Amino acid sequence: MTNLTLRNQLTPKQIVEKLDQYIIGQNGAKKSVAVALRNRYRRQLMDESIRDEIIPKNILMIGPTGVGKTEIARRIAKIVRAPFSKVEATKFTEVGYVGRDVESMVRDLVEVSVRLVKEEKMQLVRVKAEKNAEKRLIKLLAPSQKKKQTTSQNPLEALFGGMNQPDESPEEEVDQELKNKRSQIEWRLQNGELDDEIVTVEVKEQQNPMLDMMRGAGMDQMNGMQDALSGMFPAKKKKRKVTVREAKKILFEDEASKLIDADELAAEGIHRAEQMGMIFIDEIDKIASKEGGGNAQVSREGVQRDILPIVEGSQISTKYGTVNTEYILFIAAGAFHMSKPSDLIPELQGRFPIRIELDKLTQEDFYKILTEPDNALIKQYKALLKTEGIDLIFTKEAVERIAEIAFQVNQDSDNIGARRLHTILEKLLEDLLFEAPEINMESIKVTENYVNEKLAPIMQNKDLTQFIL
């Protein structure tokens, strides 16, 4: 990375400004994450002798649910297009117990990283891949007479997916009539006239969904064996009838994959995961050990000890190659209602030197969440009803009342942070969303009286409040 590329990267202040577009408050957390991110760019500029000595300062976020812990990490990864993986600590168990192996978090990160790199490389070969895909599609829509004659297939070839549709060889003669037909199809294809026509294409068979279900039951170790076996035989394919519009996408992806070097893709994916990857470990407080926990405490402490070497830096085998986790940034988060950070084993505590306590949301925060972010909830509901031709208008007093109710319900019952706004707005607009297709009005105004009318009966009944809001 050169000085020029570093100057082109976002500064910590710019990162915080971008986060402000989506997340209200929590400036301390935003600052810490922005600095951690900038330090990764700075590290790339250093001499190799000192670069290897500088490891990311992992972050521990402490705060109740719904205050923005996950959203900060998720948004930061999107802003910088860094590989990002979110896991829940409660999904893991120590090796030998039923559950997911902790190493799977690294494998998930590498999958995301390789996918990001592949998307970028596909854009680089897009023009050529689209041209090749179009040629194949034209041949499918106007096959030669020789192609139409079906040949008996070897049983073993059929078993292992040898169903490829061979294109005409360069030496094969194509008569003038077929050339004219294909030329006409090409013109119509480029003008979108054939987008809704049906064509038969061959696609790779998807992995059996049962295998995905088994992964959750501690079967991550099967991945390597499955990948090794799949490499021994050609990918099994099946014929599918799709529209020309869908066929364009299928054939483009297939042609783009042929133009991308698989080894280079894997190497770059691993490098990016190692140098720029971020793993968000949620609910880490749930595996904090407490005295007198019995077998449950042993299991929780076991998970911590399994996570420790990954956070410290270790070599993890994936289907793309070995990954060094030493320079991956780990962000852990938890509410710590029933435990405290000091309940984590000392070695793990030491691996999260940056501690950030996120603030509880105030009534003013709720108001800002409803109105200020680019993806604010009120803007979302307005857009939903706009599709029905209705202009939804909220008065300032109505929004203030919604914020007040959300804050009050959080105070009186379980505090679920900003997520409370989802339940309140859904209840408030339930009838309107249901009746919208039959309403012959160009605009509807939501006033403070409307909010009180819809929510007051529920607010007055504590039992109903707990169940509905």
Curated annotation (Swiss-Prot):
UniProt-annotated binding residues for ATP: I24, G66, V67, G68, K69, T70, E71, D282, E347, R419
InterPro entries: AAA+_ATPase, ATP-dep_Clp_protease_ClpX, ATPase_AAA_core, Clp_ATPase_C, HslU, P-loop_NTPase
Presence of keyword Signal: no
Gene3D superfamilies documented for this protein: 1.10.8.60, DNA helicase RuvA subunit, C-terminal domain, P-loop containing nucleotide triphosphate hydrolases
Any matching Pfam family: ClpB_D2-small
Function: ATPase subunit of a proteasome-like degradation complex; this subunit has chaperone activity. The binding of ATP and its subsequent hydrolysis by HslU are essential for unfolding of protein substrates subsequently hydrolyzed by HslV. HslU recognizes the N-terminal part of its protein substrates and unfolds these before they are guided to HslV for hydrolysis.
Record family assignment: Belongs to the ClpX chaperone family. HslU subfamily.
Protein name: ATP-dependent protease ATPase subunit HslU
Taxonomic source organism: Listeria monocytogenes serovar 1/2a (strain ATCC BAA-679 / EGD-e)
Organism taxonomic ancestry: Bacteria, Bacillati, Bacillota, Bacilli, Bacillales
